[in-house]
């Protein structure tokens, strides 16, 4: 049995949700209703996020990148946490509902690209189009967009110990199949609604402390 860590990006590795930051800065007011319908699960994540990015003109590409480079902050303790998982030969994957054009640059030098799974974007038309290279498998019918539970099944064995770290509705399906969940913000609410056991965290120092204890118990 090996330990596999599957970590969200927006609002988890970064302090803020970068998609929401982009929408607040660059999208028209109508985007707010779409966001609320995603959170209430009236819209699937795939449908809702596709609609959100259709509000954003592609000619803002460079401006958006610069905005995120200036404003996105990596959560406290993440650098040390990555060093810890590497030293302990723990498999670590970023499974993000975020977009390639900002996830890769913000994680450059921290996480190898082959350990990052995110959505792809097309800037060839007037508005941003989202492509979905990691859809739901036959065991998930939630139209997740990037399906985190499907990726967990693809990247690990059933007898592995699965750890999920996340903050929002996009992490719920993954949390349902995890052996250990680290949750913050809206994911805490969803875990409680669905009777999913979780450990709350604010920094990756919190996660590292708990994971270190878990390793000691399992060893």
From Swiss-Prot:
Catalysed conversion reaction: 2-hydroxy-5-methylsulfanyl-3-oxopent-1-enyl phosphate + H2O = 1,2-dihydroxy-5-(methylsulfanyl)pent-1-en-3-one + phosphate
- What domain of life is recorded for the organism? Bacteria
Q: Name one GO molecular function term.
A: 2-hydroxy-3-keto-5-methylthiopentenyl-1-phosphate phosphatase activity
Q: List the disulfide bonds.
A: none
State the Pfam families in the record.
Answer: HAD
Per the record, the pathway is: Amino-acid biosynthesis; L-methionine biosynthesis via salvage pathway; L-methionine from S-methyl-5-thio-alpha-D-ribose 1-phosphate: step 4/6
One biological-process term from Gene Ontology?
Answer: L-methionine salvage from methylthioadenosine
E.C. numbers: 3.1.3.87
Which UniProt keywords are present, listed alphabetically?
Amino-acid biosynthesis, Hydrolase, Methionine biosynthesis
Concerning InterPro entries, the annotation shows: HAD-like_hydrolase_phosphatase (IPR050849), HAD-like_sf (IPR036412), HAD-SF_hydro_IB_MtnX (IPR017718), HAD_hydro_PyrdxlP_Pase-like (IPR006384), HAD_sf (IPR023214)
Record's function text: Dephosphorylates 2-hydroxy-3-keto-5-methylthiopentenyl-1-phosphate (HK-MTPenyl-1-P) yielding 1,2-dihydroxy-3-keto-5-methylthiopentene (DHK-MTPene).
Q: Which family does it belong to?
A: Belongs to the HAD-like hydrolase superfamily. MtnX family.
Please name the PANTHER family in this protein's record: PHOSPHORIC MONOESTER HYDROLASE, UPF0655 PROTEIN YCR015C
Q: What is this protein called?
A: 2-hydroxy-3-keto-5-methylthiopentenyl-1-phosphate phosphatase
- The species this protein belongs to is Bacillus cereus (strain AH187)
Q: Which gene encodes it?
A: mtnX
